[in-house]
Amino acid sequence: MFFKKVSLLVLLIVSLSINAQIDAENLDNLVKETLQTFDVPGISVGIIKDGKIVYAKGHGIRSLTNKKEMNENTLVGVASNSKGFTCFALAMLVDAGKLNWDDKVRKHIPEFQLYDAWVTEQFTVRDLVTHRSGMSLGAGDLMFFPEGNDFTSKDVIKNVKYLKPVSSIRSEFTYNNNMFIIAGEVLKRVSGLSWEEFIETKIMNPVGMTHSKASYNRVTDRTNIIDAHTRAE
């Protein structure tokens, strides 16, 4: 049901935006209905057509505490959508001839080690970003969640060998966050820039995303940023 609702929302927004003129009033009403349907405090919507922003608006509130309204400039965390930035960044290095998708991870991170010696030696950059490590959904997530603990990417690399597989390598799609943390470390070692520095200087800034930051900790002005919320049982 959740997927159907999301699909319907996307289709409706697309249908409202295919014309040269955006029907802002209908779109506003749709977003308001969406807020009620999903029971969320706020949402930001942006539509780009032919390289131009034709709709940008915040709806609802950014915090249940202060009740301040969302607007088109409110900073919102993108969570796992950041994985797309990681893949894009790695692809830039591949295009530049500095990296290959089928490079062994140990070529760039010699201390990398998984649950099995053979798997460790065969594991590639492609494996890191295609969720086929063989480890279970959510395996090792407590190494970096909740945000604010003192674990680093080096700690993840050191401890990922203790995570047990639930399937053989490349046999199944099993979503795993830690492999992307390690992919970020590959990016750092090949480019000489931290993941955050690369994302901001090579991707965000060149396309005008100067108001965006690669992580919450890099946001210096927090006067217009959302609070994280969760439903109380």
Report the location of each language-model feature.
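Active-site SXXK
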Residues: D28-V31, V45, G51, H59, ...
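Short, glycine/proline-biased beta-turn/loop segments that scaffold the active-site neighborhood
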Residues: W101-D116, P206-V207
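Short, surface-exposed loop or secondary-structure junction motifs
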Residues: H59, A117-E233
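N-terminal signal peptide c-region/cleavage motif recognized by signal peptidases
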Residues: S15-N19
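N-terminal secretory signal peptides that target proteins for export/translocation
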Residues: M1-F3
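Short, conserved catalytic-motif segment at the N-terminal edge
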Residues: I22-V76, N100, K158-K164
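Sec-dependent N-terminal signal peptides
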Residues: K5-V14
